[in-house]
């Protein structure tokens, strides 16, 4: 065993006196050396705590006999030290925990980290001042140097058995005053949960003893799948809106193109390009079928005949609506009929037996297109000639000082200044002249409409004949083509 000289301080609970006794432990049997004042101890050389023996009521430990009694009591005590140590720690645990919490609260308020003190070397002197129940008492423990001779043995630093009692380092056994808590090892930067200003959260404490920096809460996770689905839905809606807008623009452009195609077909007579089926069904330009056109033509003819015989005013109103729509078509129909008659006579005179069916069809279609293209400018020229051939109004003779009146009457427009310069009689003459012109124009319009209906009927009949001839020619051509390979 290791030899060490220690001073044991014995506290007297009744009188407040203490006595010191020196003893040495050398690991030898005390029975063999009864006269000696040495005692056996298991305190290690690294333990720097004060060994306190329980005080007796009327005796002090200064006599050698008292030392022998303590040593014998220590040797007779056979209870295992770890079990006894556990019991004592359990006794002191509630008070120690309360004191530890108070000390930790003070350290938290001061804002520095309570680091554990480094291990003391053998020979260091530590002083602890404790306040007892009756007044301030101090206990000083000095680590004696190891004994040079004797058995050296390293003991547990917490093995404090002397006389059957476990003595906590730095505590008098009989004092019931405030006790200093035994500091337990704590994890680095750790604190009791729910204590201090940063309770409920993680507090990072810098190693240099700075203030506690609370850790920021973690960012909540993002639901990327839901976000991607939402963005895809928005893109799909935008694409639908774009498609709808493009469809609208396409429909408007298609309507415009259809109008242009209708105008071109009306001008160039593209019904020959559409094939023979167009003559019995509605064309792309919206032209009605042949049977409906024939029936409407007969109804129009009867309607105009009845209206012309019954009421002239209604004829005048109808003429105003029909002039803007149908009058330009009458010379065109006349011209087209004349060209068609001339073409039929030329076809009858020529010998077409040598020509192929397809070539003859293409030739006839080209001639029809040329005739229809020339019809519109020729109709305009004819209208201008008719205007020049008209007689001047008799109002020009009544108003010699106003030569421009006749021209204004021909254009059917008079200025307010001219009307203010005229007398009532002159204005009455102009009104009567205008009524007479209206009647004559209505009669002329009725005649032209009748002619137009007749020409439409002839045109429909000719188209039916052309369709029949085309079908017959196609069948003949197929029959001839079938016979040629057979031969």
Curated annotation (Swiss-Prot):
Question: Where are the compositionally biased (Basic and acidic residues) regions?
Answer: 14-27, 107-123, 153-162, 309-323
Q: Where is the composition biased (Acidic residues)?
A: 92-106, 344-354
* GO annotation terms (biological process): positive regulation of hippo signaling
* Source organism superkingdom: Eukaryota
The entry's localization annotation reads:
Cytoplasm
The chain residues annotated with the modification Phosphoserine are: 117
| Keywords assigned by UniProt, alphabetized | Coiled coil, Cytoplasm, Phosphoprotein
Biased composition of type Polar residues is found at: 242-255, 324-335
The question of whether Kinase is a record keyword is answered with no
List the GO terms this entry assigns under cellular component, sorted alphabetically: cell junction; cytoplasm; plasma membrane
Major subcellular location class: cytoplasm
**Which stretches are transmembrane?**
none
Q: In which tissues is it expressed?
A: Preferentially expressed in brain, skeletal muscles and heart. Also expressed in detected in pancreas, kidney, liver, lung, and placenta.
The UniProt entry, under InterPro entries, shows:
SCHIP_1 (IPR039045), SCHIP_1_C (IPR015649)
Q: Where is the composition biased (Low complexity)?
A: 32-67
| Gene Ontology molecular function | identical protein binding
Which residues fall in a coiled-coil region? 424-458
**Region listing for Disordered, in residue ranges:** 1-74, 88-221, 236-260, 308-354
**Keyword flag Cytoplasm:** yes
Q: Name one Pfam family in it.
A: SCHIP-1_C
PANTHER family this protein is in? IQCJ-SCHIP1 READTHROUGH TRANSCRIPT PROTEIN-RELATED, SCHWANNOMIN INTERACTING PROTEIN 1
Q: How does it assemble?
A: Homooligomer (via coiled coil domain). Interacts with NF2; the interaction is direct. Interacts with ANK3.
Q: Which family does it belong to?
A: Belongs to the SCHIP1 family.
Q: What is this protein called?
A: Schwannomin-interacting protein 1
What species does this protein belong to? Homo sapiens
Q: What gene name does this entry carry?
A: SCHIP1
């Amino acid at each position: 065993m290791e030899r060490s000289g220690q001073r044991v301080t014995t506290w007297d609970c009744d009188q407040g006196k203490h006595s010191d006794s020196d003893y040495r432990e050398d690991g030898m049997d005390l029975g063999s050396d009864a006269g000696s004042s040495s005692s056996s101890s298991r305190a290690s050389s690294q333990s720097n705590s004060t060994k306190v023996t329980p005080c007796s009521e009327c005796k002090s430990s200064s006599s050698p006999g008292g030392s022998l009694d303590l040593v014998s009591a220590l040797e007779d005590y056979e209870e295992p030290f770890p079990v006894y140590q556990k019991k004592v720690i359990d006794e002191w645990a509630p008070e120690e925990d309360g004191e530890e919490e108070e000390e930790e609260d003070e350290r938290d308020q001061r804002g520095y980290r309570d680091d554990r003190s480094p291990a003391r070397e053998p020979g260091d002197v530590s002083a602890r001042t404790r306040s007892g129940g009756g007044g301030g008492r101090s206990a000083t423990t000095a680590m004696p140097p190891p004994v040079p001779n004797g058995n050296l043995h390293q003991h547990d630093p917490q093995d404090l058995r002397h006389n059957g009692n476990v003595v906590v380092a730095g505590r008098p056994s009989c004092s019931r005053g405030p006790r200093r808590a035994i500091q337990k090892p704590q994890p680095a930067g750790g604190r009791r949960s729910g204590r201090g200003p940063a309770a409920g959260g993680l507090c990072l404490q810098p190693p240099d003893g700075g203030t506690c920096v609370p850790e920021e809460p973690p960012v909540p996770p993002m639901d990327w799948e839901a976000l991607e689905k939402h963005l895809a839905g928005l893109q799909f809606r935008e694409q639908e809106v774009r498609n709808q807008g493009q469809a609208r623009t396409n429909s408007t452009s298609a309507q415009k193109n259809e109008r242009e195609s209708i105008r071109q077909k009306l001008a160039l007579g593209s019904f020959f390009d559409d094939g023979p089926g167009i003559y019995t069904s509605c064309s792309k330009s919206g032209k009605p079928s042949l049977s409906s056109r024939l029936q409407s033509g007969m109804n129009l003819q009867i309607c105009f005949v009845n209206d012309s015989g019954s009421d002239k005013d209604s004829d005048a109103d109808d003429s105003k609506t029909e002039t803007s729509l149908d009058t330009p078509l009458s010379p065109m129909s006349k011209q087209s009929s004349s060209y068609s008659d001339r073409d039929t006579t030329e076809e009858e005179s020529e010998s077409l037996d040598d020509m192929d069916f397809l070539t003859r069809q293409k030739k006839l279609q080209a001639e029809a297109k040329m005739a229809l293209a020339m019809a519109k400018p020729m109709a305009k020229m004819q209208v201008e000639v008719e205007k020049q051939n008209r007689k001047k109004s008799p109002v020009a003779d009544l108003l010699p000082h106003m030569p421009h009146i006749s021209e204004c009457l021909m254009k059917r427009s008079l200025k307010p200044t001219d009307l203010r310069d005229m007398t009532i009689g002159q204005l009455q003459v102009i009104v009567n002249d205008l009524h007479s012109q209206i009647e004559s124009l209505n009669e002329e319009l009725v005649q032209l409409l009748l002619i137009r209906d007749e020409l439409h009927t002839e045109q429909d009949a000719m188209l039916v004949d052309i369709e029949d001839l085309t079908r017959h020619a196609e069948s003949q051509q197929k029959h001839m083509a079938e016979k040629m390979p057979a031969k």
